[in-house]
Amino acid sequence: VAAEHGAIGCIIYSDPREDGYFRGDVYPKGGYRNEQSGQRGSVADMPLYSGDPLTPGIGATEDAKRLAVKDAPTITKIPVLPISYGDALPLLKALGGPMAPDDWKGALPIPYHLGAGPARVHLKLAFNWELKPIYDVIARLPGAERPDEWVIRGNHHDGWVNGASDPVSGLVAELEEARAVGELAKSGWKPKRTLIYAAWDGEEPGLLGSTEWAETHAAELREHAVVYINSDSNSRGFFNAGGSHTLETFVNQAVRDVTDPEKGISVLDRSVARTQLNGATDRQADAKAKRIRLEPLGSGSDYTPFLQHLGISALNIGYGGEGEYGQYHSAYDSFDHFVRFADPKFEYGVALAKTAGRLDLRLINADVLPMTFDPFNVAVGKYVDEVVKLTDTLRQEAEDRNQRLDDKVFQAVDDPTQTYWVAPPRLDVAPYLNFAPLQNAVAVLKKSTAAYTKAFTAATAGGKTLPAEKANRLNAILMKSEQSLTRPDGLPRRSWYVHQIYAPGFYTGYGVKTLPAVREALEQRDWKEATAEIPLVAATIEAFAGEIDKATAVLGTK
């Protein structure tokens, strides 16, 4: 974005307001970021695609056809350098010009000026564009009954510098799961489905290991993958989960059986209690029902290629919220920091292993895959309501601003000594778009969901089990249902992202955009694109409802 607006270089720092002394004592006294701590990270334009910038959409194998570096669209066109706030202070202190808006100001002991100048900086960076191998570690335990149905569990193993919290805190939980499952296998136990454990390399530079593996094996994964379960950093606190809403009921059932090590109650009950105290109004019904809602996933970890590119149901799970987390992506993400400020008793790594282990084992041994459609129906209905309301909000905002410009309100309150200030531009008023296709699709989805829930409840009443042949036919539909939420041509301006319900923001990065093709067109006031995308997204939702109808039909057969 900086380059698009004319910047020729970019220096990034983490302000102490975000995770430094504004939050608490800095390391080593406390856990927050000190003045020498710089936050590393990838500045690849991953909202276009993740993975190797030179091989978009294909695996980065030795003989893969590669783009030239200058032609890779995710590689930034300007130099970028992260520094600490201690190093940023003299640069910011030397800036002149007008004061920054209040929401741009941090916690450094200086007035925050916008510039330009009079300070000048010489930015010199060296780049190494050599190709180097990365190493994914993959372990496979074949299923005894359904070997062609795969449950995949992953966490990355690379880190910036020491990486005690990110990724090791999550990786050790996965390794312990794998060790325990290995002991079961040694005793003669066999899973029904194939279980794959993966430790991904190159996550930090751009989800390289997971993306290239997923792209290399794309056809196999679309055919055989059931669910991908991801974890990353982990620390003391509350259970958090995001992912495919068809897995929401399944996750709630599993975490009822995991005990929180600090409180001695289930991690579900603890998360529900947090929602009761701090949750938004629309979450209180979930809290009363003693359930947690899965968050929709954008990007930022290794679930991205599975969910967003291949349409494979995915989860991202972990614990956190109570540690002092100021070491992120720095040299201070060390063992010492972790044992003092993240998870001193190593209890929440055990909790993560127990949680993910339950999810893994229940998935690989389920006679019928645990996808349910009611939570997805509720979520999509909410997302459609949001984009309709967004359009109304944008229309009102434009009408209000334009009227104030006509009435010279901004001119009347303008401070003549602030010469940098200019009145905001006029806004294009949103037309009254036709959302009927989306609303009708939601109605179709609701009807299909209700029919499936009724049929499944009847088929399993009184503890009845489905005949094997019927269960197999049903599973074949359930495991690929998420793929019907994708579109082969992908999202506007980024065909790699094919999921029509969840995507990272094109301009906002990791954070999720739901119904992205419609929502982002509205946010950019591109009414023509929004009009074109509404029926396409509606058709995708109806296609998903069609898969539910197929599943219902299977349950109705004798």
What positions do the PLM features span?
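Soluble metallo-hydrolase cores and metallopeptidase-like ectodomains found primarily
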Residues: 50-165, 179, 183-187
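Glycine- and acidic
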Residues: 119-123, 153-168, 194-198, 236-237, ...
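Metal-dependent peptidase/peptidase-like ectodomains
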Residues: 33-99, 146, 202-339, 345-349, ...
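Alpha-helical metal-binding/catalytic segments enriched in His/Glu/Asp
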Residues: 1, 137, 153-207, 212, ...
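Short, solvent-exposed loop/turn and secondary-structure capping segments
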Residues: 13-14, 19-27, 93-94, 149-151, ...
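A conserved hydrophobic secondary-structure block that centers on an alpha-helix together
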Residues: 1-35, 144, 148, 158-160, ...
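C-terminal amphipathic alpha-helical interaction region
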Residues: 467-558
